[in-house]
C-alpha cells in the first residue's frame, strides 16, 4: 500500500499555531489536541494516528511536514509501529521530509518501532532547517518481540537521518548524518559496542540554530548530570559539531526510553 501524510502549519491572527494544510491517505490520520501547559507558548499539539495493524510487505509510507515561520508543533504518535513478517525478497519503506522555516520549532517523537520476525524495513529521514529554527527529533526501535523470544529475528533494518541548514542563497549545508544498518544474518549485533544484551535502542537529536557551542555545552552537561539518575539504561550524550547534541540510549523497555525522551524534550523546550 502507498500511504501519504502531509501537513503544514500557519500562524493565526492571534499568534497561535494552526494546521494550514493537511492531507492523509489510509491508514494515516492526524488529530489536534487541546492546548496544554508547554514552554513553547502558542504552539500546536497534535497526534499522528494509524488504523493499520502494522507495516506490511510492499508498503511505501511517505510523510511530509512543513512548519511556517514562527510556528511551533509538538507531534506524537498513537501507538507502536509494528513491522510485520514478510516473505523473502519483500520489504517496506518509509520516507520522511521535514522543512522548518525561520524561527519555527518542532518536537517529533514517534512511538517505538517493533521489528517482527522475517521483516525488512528501510527508512530515510531528511530535515531542512531555516535560520534560528529548533528541532527535537527522536527514534526508538525494538529488536523484536522479546517476550515471544524474538531477538534479531528480522532480516534487515536501516535508518538514514540527514539534517541540513538552509542558507540565504538557497543552498543546503549538512549538520547531521546518522545511519543505522542492521543485518542480523551477517552481523554480530550482540557484540560489545553493539546492542549487547539490550533489546531497545533510542536516538534523540536536538538542534537549535539560535544557540552557540557554549550554550549547547551547558545543556549537554546538565543532561549528563540528570542521566545518572536513570536506572537500567545505558545513556550517552554527545555534543555535535555545531548547534546541537545527540542522545543515544540502550535499554530493555520501550516505555522507559519513551518517557526519558519526553522528559528530555520538556527540559530542552524550556531552555
Swiss-Prot record:
Q: Does the keyword Endoplasmic reticulum apply?
A: no
Listed GO CC annotations = cytoplasm
What are the subcellular locations of this protein?
Cytoplasm
Q: Which molecular function GO terms apply here?
A: nickel cation binding
Keywords attached to this Swiss-Prot or TrEMBL record, sorted alphabetically, are: Chaperone, Cytoplasm, Nickel insertion
Is Chaperone found in the keyword set?
yes
Q: Which residues cross the membrane?
A: none
- Which Pfam families did the record assign? UreD
What span is annotated as the signal peptide, if there is one? none
Q: Which InterPro entries match?
A: UreD (IPR002669)
PANTHER family (alphabetical): UREASE ACCESSORY PROTEIN D (PTHR33643:SF1)
Per the entry, what this protein does is: Required for maturation of urease via the functional incorporation of the urease nickel metallocenter.
Instruction: List the HAMAP family hit by this protein, alphabetically.
Output: UreD
UniProt lists the family membership as follows: Belongs to the UreD family.
Q: Kindly state the subunit structure of this protein.
A: UreD, UreF and UreG form a complex that acts as a GTP-hydrolysis-dependent molecular chaperone, activating the urease apoprotein by helping to assemble the nickel containing metallocenter of UreC. The UreE protein probably delivers the nickel.
Q: What is this protein called?
A: Urease accessory protein UreD
- Give the source species: Haemophilus influenzae (strain 86-028NP)
